[in-house]
């Protein structure tokens, strides 16, 4: 009797552990209908416009007191910046860079970028790439930020984005930034 009770308890324990362990399953991308992994290089221009009737970035928060820097430590900015094929403002629009950046350094001009590049044209229309990273805009001629995800054509995206100034108007604060994005995706 004790022996059969032991086996019943053991079997119930095993059954219970199997039932509770099924909240996940291991999959491969092909089981989800994804094709072979691809590597894509994107090249476009990011227009960060402070001036004019319709700026593409606005200040959300600024530190107390007067600061001599354009973006003093602690400044938070929201952006909805056009992404274009060429550096000209009227160049073909391929998407928007939407997100926030924060001034993160007390010693030099540095930003923490949190943005989604939302594409509105061509093969990648409706797809996004999520970018996160440190952007030391004055001390590094080419800055590199991580691609941490994506949607649509860029599901499971990973890679990096390189940013370099194409032109900057230090008086107004407007900037055109050239981006090269290297992304692995399915």
Curated annotation (Swiss-Prot):
Induction: Induced in cell culture by yeast extract, an elicitor for medicarpin induction.
GO terms (BP aspect): defense response; phenylpropanoid biosynthetic process
Biological source species: Glycine max (Soybean)
Job of this protein: Involved in pterocarpan phytoalexin biosynthesis. Catalyzes the last step in the biosynthesis of the phytoalexin medicarpin, and thereby contributes to plant defense reactions. Dirigent proteins impart stereoselectivity on the phenoxy radical-coupling reaction, yielding optically active lignans from two molecules of coniferyl alcohol in the biosynthesis of lignans, flavonolignans, and alkaloids and thus plays a central role in plant secondary metabolism.
Catalytic activity: a (4R)-4,2'-dihydroxyisoflavan = a pterocarpan + H2O; (3R,4R)-7,2'-dihydroxy-4'-methoxyisoflavanol = (-)-medicarpin + H2O; (3R,4R)-3-(6-hydroxy-1,3-benzodioxol-5-yl)-3,4-dihydro-2H-chromene-4,7-diol = (-)-maackiain + H2O; (3S,4R)-7,2'-dihydroxy-4'-methoxyisoflavanol = (+)-medicarpin + H2O
InterPro entries noted in UniProt: Allene_oxi_cyc_Dirigent (IPR044859), Dirigent (IPR004265)
Gene: PTS1
Gene Ontology terms for molecular function: pterocarpan synthase activity
Name of the protein this chain belongs to: Pterocarpan synthase 1
Subcellular localization(s) per the UniProt record: Secreted, Extracellular space, Apoplast
């Amino acid at each position: 009797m004790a022996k059969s009770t032991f086996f019943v308890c053991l079997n119930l324990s095993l059954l219970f552990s199997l039932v509770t362990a099924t909240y996940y399953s291991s999959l491969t991308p092909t089981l989800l209908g994804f094709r072979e992994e691809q590597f894509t290089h994107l090249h476009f221009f990011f227009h960060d416009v402070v001036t004019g009737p319709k700026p593409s970035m606005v200040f959300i928060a600024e530190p107390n007191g007067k600061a001599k820097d354009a973006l003093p430590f602690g400044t938070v900015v929201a952006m909805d910046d056009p992404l274009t094929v060429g550096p000209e403002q009227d160049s073909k629009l391929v998407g928007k860079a939407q997100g926030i950046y924060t001034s993160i350094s007390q010693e030099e001009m540095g930003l923490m970028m949190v943005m989604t590049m939302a594409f509105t044209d061509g093969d990648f229309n409706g797809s996004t790439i999520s970018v996160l990273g440190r952007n030391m805009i004055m001390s590094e001629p080419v800055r590199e930020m991580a691609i941490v995800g994506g949607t649509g054509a860029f599901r499971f995206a990973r890679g990096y984005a390189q940013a370099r100034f194409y032109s900057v108007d230090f008086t107004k604060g407007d900037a055109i930034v050239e981006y090269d994005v290297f992304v692995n995706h399915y």
